[in-house]
Curated annotation (Swiss-Prot):
Keywords (A to Z) from UniProt: Metal-binding, Nucleus, Ribonucleoprotein, RNA-binding, Zinc, Zinc-finger
Metal-binding as UniProt keyword: yes
Pfam families on file: zf-U1 (PF06220)
Subunit structure comment from the entry: U1 snRNP is composed of the 7 core Sm proteins B/B', D1, D2, D3, E, F and G that assemble in a heptameric protein ring on the Sm site of the small nuclear RNA to form the core snRNP, and at least 3 U1 snRNP-specific proteins U1-70K, U1-A and U1-C. U1-C interacts with U1 snRNA and the 5' splice-site region of the pre-mRNA.
Stretches annotated zinc finger (Matrin-type): 4-36
Signal peptide: none
Protein name: U1 small nuclear ribonucleoprotein C
Function: Component of the spliceosomal U1 snRNP, which is essential for recognition of the pre-mRNA 5' splice-site and the subsequent assembly of the spliceosome. U1-C is directly involved in initial 5' splice-site recognition for both constitutive and regulated alternative splicing. The interaction with the 5' splice-site seems to precede base-pairing between the pre-mRNA and the U1 snRNA. Stimulates commitment or early (E) complex formation by stabilizing the base pairing of the 5' end of the U1 snRNA and the 5' splice-site region.
Biological process, per Gene Ontology: mRNA 5'-splice site recognition; spliceosomal snRNP assembly
Biased composition (Pro residues): 67-109
Organism field: Nematostella vectensis
Molecular function in Gene Ontology: mRNA binding; pre-mRNA 5'-splice site binding; U1 snRNA binding; zinc ion binding
Record family assignment: Belongs to the U1 small nuclear ribonucleoprotein C family.
SUPFAM superfamilies in UniProt: beta-beta-alpha zinc fingers
Length: 138
């Protein structure tokens, strides 16, 4: 009669009956071995992913800078300056001025009246701009 082999525990069970397998699979040692097996497998998968990512970055040049760019060239438009502002001696690229200080202006076509300063709309759907409420219509 063939014996049941547990790959996780690296052992043969005494019998190949469902009750023996069930008892073995519910045991503390078997559960620890299964947990250890999958933990090790996940670590190997993570390391493989790290190795693939590292190899991909080492095989490609810096993709944010154009090829054969001279050192010190600004990144392409849309790239934000580093935290803390621009490094000394560098100017922002032409065509991308810094916004003026103060509140952010409304987007083009927003139109309508804004609430007085300090009175923001709280909760609920925003009323439509440009039309009086239903209660004020005649």
């Amino acid at each position: 009669m063939p014996k049941y082999y547990c790959d996780y525990c690296d052992t043969f069970l005494t019998h190949d009956s469902p009750s023996v397998r069930k008892t073995h699979n519910n045991g503390r040692k078997h559960k620890e071995n299964v947990r250890f097996y999958y933990q090790k497998w996940m670590e190997e998968q993570a390391q493989t992913l790290i190795d693939q990512t590292t190899a991909a970055f080492q095989s490609k040049p810096n993709s944010q800078m154009p090829p054969n760019a001279p050192p010190g060239l600004m990144p392409p438009p849309g790239m934000l300056p580093p935290p803390g502002g621009m490094p000394p001696g560098r100017m922002p690229p032409q065509g991308l001025p810094f916004p003026p200080p103060g509140p952010i202006p409304p987007p083009p076509g927003a139109g309508g009246m804004r609430p007085p300063h300090g009175q923001m709309h709280m909760g609920g759907p925003r009323p439509q701009m440009g039309r009086p409420p239903m209660s004020l219509r005649s």
